[in-house]
């Protein structure tokens, strides 16, 4: 399949010494030509794709080995990535990034990304990609629990089960932590609320706090292996990774990970190519690899759920993942503004209403 339309801007130095940009139309360029041009470029600079997140390290090592591209990454938040694309447009240094799901449409609105449709485009759900190819989700994270079964006898696979378990709950820093805030928001959905109604979650956690069942501490491997944590709530790609680390550190420990069936927010991360990418062919080639079977399996090795359901995971890896059926009722995050407003409310109300009950 030929590469889909790809418009990029490459920096050229003019006679005045200032940087100018010139459009390079890759509409008619085949995938073979992209590979050839990428080899000539020989390098790629990404943002927001650090080695220790979702096994990006494995993918970049594979891309370097397979295509000979020298890679470097600068870790940034999603907002910082798009800001960098825009601010550097006259002298670009970044080629591509990985942004939170809600930032894909925002990137299009800012006009800082360009289209590319990988050869596996048709196997990606419509909701997970821009129709013009300007962003595409490559993996998902879903709110989940990890429980020390020595402390918790019943599976904690729902907020209702958690409510009735009697165990102490670890969320981390709800005032400042995004994942902890997402856990509270997931709880709101479980009991009939949502971004515009957080009351069910605050009723739930108020009761837990009064019962002494809210852990004031944060998660750490040491606390988990010492048996100080009953259950911790965060994204599945973290709970599964933390499970492995706990078992490695304390072979006798048994950790059970589940998606919260009655309220589990799900958020994806989208690949974007800088409109002004200095190495556009390398960026397109990287997107191609990251959406390939190999690239999707790389994400799964980092315990992120691949966006492509047609990729068959190796049996040894599939056995380590949370079963597919637990994701049936996951709630996708689509409205960034509503989520941001809800998180701000969660942070302020938690500080005012919950923390005093924990002291």
Named regions from a protein language model:
Residues 1-41, 359:
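Short, low-complexity disordered leader/linker segments with a strong preference
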Residues 23-32, 39-58, 269:
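Extracytoplasmic "Venus flytrap"
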Residues 27, 328-359:
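Conserved C-terminal helix/tail region of periplasmic/extracytoplasmic solute-binding proteins
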Residues 41, 140-142, 266-270:
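Short, solvent-exposed beta-strand edge segments and adjacent coil->beta transition regions
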Residues 45-60, 72-86, 90-229, 242:
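Extracytoplasmic ligand-binding site segments that recognize negatively charged/polar headgroups
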Residues 59-67:
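A short alpha-helix/helix-coil micro-patch that ends at or immediately precedes a cysteine
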Residues 214-276, 311, 315-320:
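Extracytoplasmic/periplasmic substrate-binding proteins
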Residues 264, 269-334:
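Mature extracytoplasmic/periplasmic domains
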């Amino acid at each position: 399949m030929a590469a889909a339309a790809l418009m990029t801007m490459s920096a050229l130095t003019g006679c005045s010494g200032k940087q100018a940009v010139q459009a390079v139309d890759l509409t008619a360029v085949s995938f073979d030509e992209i590979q050839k041009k990428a080899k000539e470029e020989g390098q790629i600079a990404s943002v927001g794709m650090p080695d220790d997140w979702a096994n990006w390290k494995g993918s970049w090592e594979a891309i370097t080995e397979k295509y000979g591209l020298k890679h470097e990454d600068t870790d940034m938040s999603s907002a910082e990535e798009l800001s960098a694309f825009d601010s550097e447009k006259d002298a670009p240094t970044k080629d591509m990034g990985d942004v939170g799901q809600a930032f894909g449409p925002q990137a299009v609105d800012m006009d800082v990304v360009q289209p590319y449709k990988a050869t596996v485009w048709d196997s990606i759900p419509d909701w997970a990609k821009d129709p013009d190819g300007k962003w595409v989700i490559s993996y998902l994270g879903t709110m989940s629990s990890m429980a020390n079964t020595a402390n918790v006898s019943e599976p904690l696979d729902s907020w209702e089960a958690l409510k009735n378990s009697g165990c102490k709950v670890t969320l981390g820093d709800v005032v400042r932590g995004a994942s902890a805030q997402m856990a509270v928001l997931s709880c709101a959905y479980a009991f009939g609320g949502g971004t515009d109604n957080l009351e069910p979650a605050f009723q739930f956690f108020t009761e837990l706090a009064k019962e002494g069942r809210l852990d004031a501490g944060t998660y750490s491997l040491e606390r988990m292996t010492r048996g100080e944590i009953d259950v911790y709530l965060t994204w599945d790609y973290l709970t599964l990774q933390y499970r492995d680390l706990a078992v490695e550190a304390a072979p006798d420990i048994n950790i059970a990970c589940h998606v919260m069936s009655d309220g589990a927010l799900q958020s994806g991360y989208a690949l974007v190519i800088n409109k002004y990418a200095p190495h556009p062919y390398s960026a397109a080639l990287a997107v191609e690899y990251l959406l390939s079977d190999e690239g999707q399996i790389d994400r799964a090795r980092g315990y992120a759920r691949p966006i492509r359901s047609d990729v068959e995971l190796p049996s040894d890896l599939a056995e380590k993942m949370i079963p597919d059926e637990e994701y049936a009722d996951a709630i996708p995050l689509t409205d960034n503004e509503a989520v941001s407003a809800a998180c701000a409310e969660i942070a302020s109300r938690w500080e005012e209403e919950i923390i005093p009950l924990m002291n």
